[in-house]
């Protein structure tokens, strides 16, 4: 969304901040953890700045990072763009999804981000790549889920559903299952999570309902919900498995450590799953043995796994309280306070 004629111009201080963060993000000489911190700082600006011009400038700075050779960084750029709720994010996301030379992990994240934005105008490109012959299965599945999310977002059914309040501020690939008069028990949601006869969107809804029953961690349903989610790491879909690992990263629940460690340690596992498991372990970095596990894979054969472990160890330092803020400027946490 380009600023209109009456939109306030970006202030000098905001312009200086965005330019400085963009420089850190786009510099191949900057350590990867610094680039990630710059990215989440730009996301903060893109979602909280008082004027549209500054928000758009931050989005454009994020999009400039797609020139990087790092698939890990680029997939995180796409995720952040999808969280902005701003039409300025649409063009770069469509370009990434359309680029058949781009890493499938980045293209999948771009498709998911278009779904998170929720606008029906993007159904055309999502249907195109869902139906494209010989398309990577993770992209086909992501487009399928994104289409259903957009259709749900714009449906009359959406207005009737009562959703359980969530501790998490993220825009998820699917909403949790709606509340009913008798709230679904963990066991029931676990069955729905693992029902391979159901469509992925429905299974994702069960996944995010279980996530919300696992937070805060002292809820009586928390550990059972985490253990139910862990069963999803045995699913046949790598996309599904990677989303389970992402949810574990949001929860930072110690009961997930064994399952995440197993996923990261399995060198036959898809790299998109292993990398997500590594980052999730980073959010648990204050727990005994987690940093040692991550260090074991700093020289993994898969670049995205190596880089994820570098970033995860940086996150672990933050989680241990050695840094005041993860972002270079204050960034709201994924889970609402």
UniProtKB/Swiss-Prot annotation:
GO molecular function, one term: deoxyhypusine monooxygenase activity
Protein EC: 1.14.99.29
Cofactor note: Binds 2 Fe(2+) ions per subunit.
GO CC terms, sorted: cytoplasm; nucleus
Superkingdom per UniProt: Eukaryota
Biased composition (Basic and acidic residues): 156-165
Cofactor: Fe(2+)
InterPro entries, per database record: ARM-like, ARM-type_fold, Deoxyhypusine_hydroxylase, HEAT_type_2, PBS_lyase_HEAT
Binding sites annotated in the UniProt record for Fe cation 2: 242-243, 275-276
Known catalytic reactions: [eIF5A protein]-deoxyhypusine + AH2 + O2 = [eIF5A protein]-hypusine + A + H2O
Keywords (A to Z) from UniProt: Cytoplasm, Hypusine biosynthesis, Iron, Metal-binding, Monooxygenase, Nucleus, Oxidoreductase, Repeat
Family: Belongs to the deoxyhypusine hydroxylase family.
PANTHER family linked: DEOXYHYPUSINE HYDROXYLASE, PBS LYASE HEAT-LIKE PROTEIN
Listed name of the protein: Deoxyhypusine hydroxylase
The organism's taxonomic lineage, starting at the top: Eukaryota, Fungi, Dikarya, Ascomycota, Pezizomycotina
């Amino acid at each position: 969304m380009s600023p209109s004629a009456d939109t306030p111009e970006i202030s000098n201080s905001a312009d200086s901040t965005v330019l400085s963060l963009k420089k850190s993000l786009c510099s191949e000489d900057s350590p990867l953890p610094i680039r990630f911190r710059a990215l989440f700082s730009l996301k903060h600006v893109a979602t909280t700045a008082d004027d549209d011009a500054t928000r758009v400038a931050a989005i454009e700075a994020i999009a400039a990072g797609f020139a990087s050779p790092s698939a890990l960084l680029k997939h995180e750029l796409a995720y952040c763009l999808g969280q902005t709720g701003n039409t300025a994010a649409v063009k770069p996301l469509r370009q990434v999804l359309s680029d058949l030379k781009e890493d499938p992990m980045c293209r999948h994240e771009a498709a998911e981000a278009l779904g998170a934005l929720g606008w029906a105008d993007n159904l055309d490109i999502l249907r195109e790549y869902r139906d494209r012959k010989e398309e990577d299965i993770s992209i086909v599945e992501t487009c399928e889920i994104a289409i259903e999310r957009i259709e749900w977002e714009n449906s009359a059914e959406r207005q009737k559903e009562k959703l359980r309040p969530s501790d998490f501020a993220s825009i998820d690939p699917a909403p949790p299952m709606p509340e009913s008069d008798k709230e679904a028990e963990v066991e029931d949601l676990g069955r729905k999570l693992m029902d391979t006869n159901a469509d992925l969107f429905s299974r994702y809804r069960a996944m995010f309902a279980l996530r919300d029953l696992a937070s805060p961690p002292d809820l009586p349903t928390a550990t059972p919900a985490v253990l139910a989610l862990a069963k999803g790491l045995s699913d046949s879909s790598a996309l599904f498995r990677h989303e389970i690992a992402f949810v574990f990263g949001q929860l930072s629940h110690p009961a997930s450590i064994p399952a995440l460690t197993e996923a990261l340690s399995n060198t036959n596992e898809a790299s998109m799953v292993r990398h997500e498991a590594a980052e999730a372990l980073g959010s648990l970095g204050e727990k005994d043995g987690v940093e040692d596990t991550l260090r074991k894979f700093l020289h993994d054969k898969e670049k995205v796994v190596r880089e994820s472990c570098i970033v995860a160890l940086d996150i672990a330092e933050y989680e241990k309280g050695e840094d005041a803020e993860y972002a270079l400027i204050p960034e709201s946490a994924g889970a609402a306070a």
